[in-house]
């Protein structure tokens, strides 16, 4: 069939992963709601749904890597699809984070009488922005420089240098996640402490979750680079990871200025 096709597009074979992913997502959602409302079996259904969903993600991406790396189905025309999809996904994530920052700004610019008409609310402790938050802020942009180094190394065909750069990126990402964990451990307030706690932990936690996802993405890229999967002309997966990581490291500046610094004084 491949030999007879006269176009540059990849006609994928029938796959069970879309339906299995849908079932895993359904079980995760229903199980999560049941667990939050203390229904019997909610935790079990949630755990099974997550396991099924993670397994589906693993085997589905495994098949995509086989089709692109080993079978050569990802032509230039096919590569445009993942590129456009990655860009649109990042745009949707920007809108997500914009909503959280909007909520924080709205609450701080017009504090209600229920919280004393001041921001931060009366009686709520806040983190000192000039300690761990300030120390943590330049780490992600530094990791962004390291991932750019890796990209240039791939384009130059220097495989070992690309691996070293990706290792440096991942290490900086882990340090950043560790610092954020220290922030939360030392935080004088919780997510249930008024609108300040809700917006603070939701915005910073959502960004921290993106850092973890991006770190996993880069770890996979590092393994693939070590195995020789990425070449000068075929490294769309790495490009998507690099774009995502630049989004993550730039966004870090916004919570520091609007939440830690301006919103916490």
UniProtKB/Swiss-Prot annotation:
Keyword Coiled coil among UniProt keywords: no
Family the UniProt entry places it in: Belongs to the cytochrome c oxidase subunit 3 family.
Record text on subunit structure and interactions: Component of the cytochrome c oxidase (complex IV, CIV), a multisubunit enzyme composed of a catalytic core of 3 subunits and several supernumerary subunits. The complex exists as a monomer or a dimer and forms supercomplexes (SCs) in the inner mitochondrial membrane with ubiquinol-cytochrome c oxidoreductase (cytochrome b-c1 complex, complex III, CIII).
Protein's UniProt name: Cytochrome c oxidase subunit 3
Membrane topology: Multi-pass membrane protein
Species for this entry: Oryza sativa subsp. indica
Subcellular location: Mitochondrion inner membrane
The organism's place on the tree of life at top rank: Eukaryota
UniProt-listed SUPFAM superfamilies: Cytochrome c oxidase subunit III-like (SSF81452)
């Amino acid at each position: 069939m491949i030999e007879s096709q006269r176009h540059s597009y990849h006609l994928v074979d029938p796959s069970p992963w879309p339906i299995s992913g849908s079932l895993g997502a359904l079980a995760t959602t229903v199980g999560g709601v049941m667990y939050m409302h203390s229904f019997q079996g909610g935790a079990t259904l949630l755990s099974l749904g997550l396991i099924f969903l993670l397994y589906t993600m693993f085997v589905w991406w495994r098949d995509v890597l086989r089709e692109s790396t080993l079978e050569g189905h990802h032509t230039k025309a096919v590569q445009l699809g993942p590129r456009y999809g990655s860009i649109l996904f990042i745009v949707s994530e920007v809108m997500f984070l914009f909503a959280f920052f909007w909520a924080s700004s709205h609450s701080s610019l017009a504090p209600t009488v229920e919280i004393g008409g001041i921001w931060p609310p009366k009686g709520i402790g806040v983190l000192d922005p000039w300690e761990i938050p300030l120390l943590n802020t330049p780490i992600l942009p530094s990791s962004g420089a390291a991932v750019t180094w890796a990209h240039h190394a791939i384009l130059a065909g220097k495989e070992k240098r690309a691996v070293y750069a990706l290792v440096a990126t991942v290490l900086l990402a882990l340090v950043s996640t560790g610092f954020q964990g220290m922030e939360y451990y030392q935080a004088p307030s919780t997510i249930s402490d008024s609108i300040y706690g809700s917006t603070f932990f939701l915005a910073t936690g959502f960004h921290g979750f993106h850092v973890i996802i991006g770190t996993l993405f880069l770890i996979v890229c590092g393994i693939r680079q070590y195995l020789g999967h990425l070449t000068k002309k075929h490294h769309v997966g790495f490009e998507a990871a690099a774009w995502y990581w630049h989004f993550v490291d730039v966004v870090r500046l916004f919570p520091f200025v609007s939440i830690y610094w301006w919103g916490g004084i």
